[in-house]
Amino acid sequence: MRIVLALALALAGLAARAQGNEVPGWFAESFLEFPQDVKEAAGEGKRLMLYFWQDGCPACRKLKETTLAERAIVDQTRAYFVPVALDVHGEREVQWTDGRTMREKELARELNVRGTPTLLFLDDKGAVLLRRVGYVAPERFVATLAEARRR
């Protein structure tokens, strides 16, 4: 009986975590090896857009459900950027653009991610060229994409 109860609680926790995920389904899947991701994106004429989020973040949820749900924004983002999501409390292993390996949460600290959502746009060498923190309304998001493309 204890095993069944423990399994039920574990499954309930996984379901709750999945519902709390503030990442759009159209974001790229990545092995989080950013030297390779930057190179591949550049080969396609794109740049990386890193999206730092956390479960239970109201601004992350609003960004996902409004701005990142607009078809024109999805299309424009995917045309010029490769969006990759990172959990500020995450344990996944990441290889940063300088070759160092760390956990998602350590990378967030390294990049001074202090609030969520945080969007970081990288140039074709992997350097951060633009940062946006907090909810970004659709009009401002479009302007942000244009600015990141110009830099």
Regions found by a protein language model. Name each.
Residues C60-R78:
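Typically the conserved alpha-helix immediately C-terminal to a functionally engaged Cys/Sec
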Residues M1-L7:
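Sec-dependent signal peptide recognition
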